[in-house]
From Swiss-Prot:
The gene is plbC. Residues 1-21 form the signal peptide. GO terms for biological process: phosphatidylethanolamine catabolic process; phosphatidylinositol catabolic process; phospholipid catabolic process. Its EC number is 3.1.1.-. Keywords: Glycoprotein, Hydrolase, Lipid degradation, Lipid metabolism, Secreted, Signal. It holds the Pfam family Phospholip_B. Probable phospholipase. The keyword Secreted applies. PANTHER family: PHOSPHOLIPASE B-LIKE PROTEIN B-RELATED, PHOSPHOLIPASE B-RELATED. One of its GO terms (cellular component) is extracellular region. This is Phospholipase B-like protein C. It comes from the Eukaryota. GO terms for molecular function: phospholipase activity.
Length: 565
């Protein structure tokens, strides 16, 4: 009976849970009363989820699905330190899986229908994943007092709770998901690298993605901008991905573990996806005052010998990022921890902004910005604060370190002189987005300027776009002409924070493709909904910016779409 009451509550919240009003700027906004839930153990050892914020329970959550009103779902989970670490994390996972089970299915369905040609993963991938889990469990048993492996174990326990919560909430036998399904969902962005490693090891299975799918490597734009007067440091990220992946969530985890966990960060807030414990974008705010983000470099040659270095005897990136964010206390320590157990999958340029090192109006201390880049069998990182002191750090899917660039195939010779080329044959400084960052970043003076820049796409008028809507900060590949060359892919969000915001632990985010200079994206236009079947998404993405905290969210005045760079 309790399960039925909770499910009815979730449904009623979807229908009636928000009130539209006018803010002081006469802009429409949503003032939401976010439903709260708690979880405890029953006498039979099973979990019970019930309405209300019971501070004596194992964990409490605020959850609402506002995809149709603001383009985001929202979940915030807090655990009770009176319970042991394993119970806290498993209950937190269960609570998330139970409450967001509908969004989880929508995310899974959209991925399977559009990404995998056979609507399934191959046996080789599943065998690889099982071997990887076996390796981690062995290391957990051998290193029971090591904080690194203690935290790896906590991630696996959270995933197990997530699976069980989903299974108990889901009433549809056609929508059952196993623990292996959740493992595959969480490692999804790493599967292409693993498939390439299996191919190079003469594996019998190698499945090409659906032809509709975006580039195997997720691409993004990121900017870390220091104001001229040293009064503010902005950090922003725009995710590039397939539009079918736009079932989105902002998540906040406040886990209060024992000293054995050695956590330097108890609270994290990030943009993410239902059923996935990492950000994927990636964009994290930590209460240690670190902000962690990345753009994907990848490996240019699918036949590269580097793929042979990918082995199951490692820890995948999706787990390493959670562990590292929790136990790192600085940019340098973050790099040292993240280097451990390098899987060589999801090879990114990571940026770690340490707001503890930024003294407003005075100086930017060494260690404010570290950059970390990864390949199979090799990593490189450095303190690049000196570059930030010149005004900004850009990130646009091209390696910064020369060795990484050479090894991953970005610096091969080419006769092409077209600066619009995305082949990787041009200099780091000559990529279109690199030139846009250089031209426009010093025109950012306010948070509104920064928001507008992270959403910028004026490809028809920007000479650096070379007529290509993909050569902008927030790409719109759906606007490519002729239409038969277009794809429903591009920038799907933007997130920004700053010293002022992180001191309040606030993130400002906008969901969906940019619609400042360009028209909003609609599934009903250009026959997109037939080419990319999706569920759980609105037809049109024309949402405003929203400010998120660890307990609530609300409107934020939109960045001016009249700003021209």
């Amino acid at each position: 009976m309790n399960k039925i009451i909770i499910l009815i509550s979730l449904f009623l919240n979807f229908l009636f849970g928000y009130v539209v009003c006018l803010n002081e700027n006469n802009q429409k906004s949503q003032n939401l009363i976010i439903p709260t839930y708690s979880i405890k153990l029953k006498s039979d050892g099973e979990y019970l989820v019930y309405s209300g914020n019971d501070t004596l329970s194992i964990a409490q959550a605020s959850y609402t699905n506002e995809m149709m009103s603001i383009g985001w779902g929202y979940i915030s989970i807090t655990t009770n330190p009176k319970y042991n670490d394993s119970l806290q994390i498993e209950a937190a996972g269960y609570l998330e899986g139970y409450l967001s089970y509908e969004m989880i299915w929508q995310n899974w369905n959209n991925m399977m229908v559009n990404q995998n040609a056979n609507n399934s993963f191959g046996n080789d991938i599943i065998s690889w994943a099982k071997e990887n889990i076996l390796y981690m469990n062995q290391q957990i048993q051998l290193n029971q007092n090591d904080p690194y492996w203690i935290n790896v174990n906590l991630v696996l326990q959270q995933l197990n709770g997530l699976t069980n919560g989903y299974s108990d909430a889901n009433q549809n036998p056609d929508r059952q998901l196993s623990l292996m399904d959740f493992i595959l969902l969480n490692m999804n962005v790493e599967i292409y690298d693993i498939m390439n490693s299996l191919k190079n090891n003469s594996s019998s299975f190698y499945q090409q993605p659906n032809n509709n799918s975006f580039d195997n490597n997720q691409h993004c734009s990121a900017l870390i901008k220091l104001t001229d007067d040293l009064t503010e440091l902005y950090t922003g990220h725009t995710t590039w991905s397939d539009y079918y992946q736009m079932v989105r969530m902002i998540k906040s985890y406040n886990f209060r573990f024992s000293k054995l966990v050695a956590a330097k960060s108890n609270t994290t807030m990030f943009s993410g996806y239902p059923g996935v414990l990492m950000s994927v974008d990636d964009f994290y705010m930590l209460d240690s005052k670190l902000v962690v983000l990345e753009t994907t470099n990848g490996i240019k040659d699918n036949d590269s010998e580097l793929f042979k270095l990918i082995k199951p005897q490692s820890v995948l990136t999706w787990i390493r990022i959670i562990v590292t964010n929790r136990i790192a206390h600085s940019g340098k320590s973050w790099c040292e921890i993240f280097e451990k157990e390098n899987s060589g999958t999801y090879n990114n340029q990571w940026m770690i902004v340490d707001y503890n090192k930024f003294i407003k109006g005075v100086r930017v201390q060494d260690g404010t910005l570290y950059v970390f880049e990864q390949l199979p069998g090799y990593v490189e990182y450095a303190d690049v604060t000196n570059i930030l002191r010149t005004g900004y750090w850009p990130s646009f899917n091209v390696p910064y370190f020369e060795t990484i660039s050479n090894m991953s195939g970005f610096n091969y010779q080419s006769s092409s002189s077209d600066s619009s080329s995305s082949s990787g044959s041009i200099a780091y400084e000559q990529y279109p987005r690199s030139q846009i960052f250089r031209r426009d970043s010093n025109k950012v003076y306010s948070i509104s300027d920064f928001q507008a820049f992270m959403r910028y796409n004026d490809f028809q008028n920007d000479p650096l776009a070379y007529g290509d809507p993909g050569n902008q900060i927030s790409s719109r590949f759906d606007l490519i002409t002729p239409q038969n060359n277009a794809s429903a892919a591009g920038g799907i969000d933007s997130k920004v924070t700053s010293l002022e915001l992180i001191n309040q632990f606030l993130m400002i985010a906008q969901s969906g493709p940019t619609h400042d200079q360009e028209p909003p994206f609609s599934w009903s236009s250009e026959n997109w909904k037939n080419k990319y079947p999706t569920i759980g998404q609105p037809d049109t993405f024309d949402f405003e910016w929203v400010t998120f905290s660890t307990t609530s969210f609300g409107s934020f005045p939109s960045a001016s779409n009249e700003k021209n760079y």
